[in-house]
Amino acid sequence: MSSEMEPLLLAWSYFRRRKFQLCADLCTQMLEKSPYDQEPDPELPVHQAAWILKARALTEMVYIDEIDVDQEGIAEMMLDENAIAQVPRPGTSLKLPGTNQTGGPSQAVRPITQAGRPITGFLRPSTQSGRPGTMEQAIRTPRTAYTARPITSSSGRFVRLGTASMLTSPDGPFINLSRLNLTKYSQKPKLAKALFEYIFHHENDVKTIHLEDVVLHLGIYPFLLRNKNHIEKNALDLAALSTEHSQYKDWWWKVQIGKCYYRLGMYREAEKQFKSALKQQEMVDTFLYLAKVYVSLDQPVTALNLFKQGLDKFPGEVTLLCGIARIYEEMNNMSSAAEYYKEVLKQDNTHVEAIACIGSNHFYSDQPEIALRFYRRLLQMGIYNGQLFNNLGLCCFYAQQYDMTLTSFERALSLAENEEEAADVWYNLGHVAVGIGDTNLAHQCFRLALVNNNNHAEAYNNLAVLEMRKGHVEQARALLQTASSLAPHMYEPHFNFATISDKIGDLQRSYVAAQKSEAAFPDHVDTQHLIKQLRQHFAML
């Protein structure tokens, strides 16, 4: 029956059913009848419709929702020219590790990332906004910093998240951007919008994949930035001309100009465009884009106020509530974050991020039974992965439901997608073994964690403690030095190394390590006692 359908109608049907490759192939066959399919023929409406539909299909194949996906590359971090206050007031910055003043679990209970924030219950790219101070810190890869580690280039993410099959075409690119007369297209609003999205989403992918080869061979970042600017400039020119043609009354084009400015790192210009768009038409997406700008400018309080303004216009909007909760979580205000995540669940009781974050908060607040209820809820919703079963196993163990503990960890090991996940499961199994007093099993589990991931700093630290209990002092010191070099933001390796050095009489190294421990966790009482004791020793010399 499909062969009897009108080709354009069939292509539109493929597009509506998200069969974008079939849609693009059918549109290509229709356009082959025209000698040049680079531009739509205004005299043939069918060709023009097929051209627009193919552009939209190619765009959808690599489309990424930029509201949630936001990753800063090393080049963007280290070459950023935006001036941000180096000594902001407490509670007003995301770039500095937040002080725990809200009654949440301390660093001794809840681990932190390299950026200085507590580990969240839900992995999301936006947690990468904590900027490292040096290039060495930026490329370091400890496990707990996976949520704060930058990738090589932010433009490279479009290739990995998009559809790889569309990066190359046997007949060359669908549209030759250098031959387009953008002024002519800007006078046709529907055509211009489809063309803009194609340039912004699809062509950026094609250009960056060629450029990554240049960066790989030459290792030069300016090439990447220059070509990236060129692509966004095409989209920006089209958006500017279309805005001018609409007499500056079309809010959609202002949002697109703001997106171009944001991707180019021109945050103040993006802010102006988003604000202008909000004056004309208040949309949830515009609030979210503008909040992203304020987060990039390290103004979380302004972003919070903006979200609350959005809630006045759109009461109960889940994305706005979730945005507030994320910012509170990044500012280490766990109690406020949990309250807003609960508000999210009142509006959408299947919101995975809210359920996971509330469950994580209960677990680290010494309430594993309540956390278990939230993780079981995720299991009932159909989520079936290694991370969930790993969390279920830990909750069952600490809630003293031992019959389900090992079964959950077995499922987690079988569902682990990579070696890093398997290493985390073995590490947690080592904790279970320590809890039941089987040090030999714990030793083997920590070893297996290191076999799967030799950058697992926590496993090195715990293995060193077990070696110290066996009396292997030098081996324990070596393991602790490895752990502290892999994860300098963790206080445990520094404190353990200081304690061992103090016991064997190496007071100088003990004092240096204790100072590092205090810098990582200023409220650690045992570190403060050790430093006080060492200073008394030095005063007596």
Swiss-Prot record:
Widely expressed. GO terms for molecular function: RNA polymerase II-specific DNA-binding transcription factor binding. TPR repeats lie at residues 14-47, 251-284, 285-317, 318-351, 352-385, 386-419, 423-456, 457-490. GO terms for biological process: axon guidance; camera-type eye photoreceptor cell differentiation; cilium assembly; establishment of anatomical structure orientation; establishment of epithelial cell apical/basal polarity; establishment of planar polarity; fat cell differentiation; inner ear receptor cell stereocilium organization. The keyword Membrane applies. The keyword Lipid metabolism does not apply. It is found in: Cytoplasm, Cytoskeleton, Microtubule organizing center, Centrosome; Cell projection, Cilium membrane; Cytoplasm; Cytoplasm, Cytoskeleton, Microtubule organizing center, Centrosome, Centriolar satellite. It comes from the Eukaryota. Keywords: Bardet-Biedl syndrome, Cell membrane, Cell projection, Ciliopathy, Cilium, Cilium biogenesis/degradation, Cytoplasm, Cytoskeleton, Disease variant, Intellectual disability, Membrane, Obesity, Protein transport, Repeat, Retinitis pigmentosa, TPR repeat, Transport. One of its GO terms (cellular component) is photoreceptor connecting cilium. Part of BBSome complex, that contains BBS1, BBS2, BBS4, BBS5, BBS7, BBS8/TTC8, BBS9 and BBIP10. Interacts with PCM1. Interacts with CCDC28B. Interacts with PKD1. It is linked to Retinitis pigmentosa 51: A retinal dystrophy belonging to the group of pigmentary retinopathies. Retinitis pigmentosa is characterized by retinal pigment deposits visible on fundus examination and primary loss of rod photoreceptor cells followed by secondary loss of cone photoreceptors. Patients typically have night vision blindness and loss of midperipheral visual field. As their condition progresses, they lose their far peripheral visual field and eventually central vision as well. This is Tetratricopeptide repeat protein 8. The gene is TTC8.
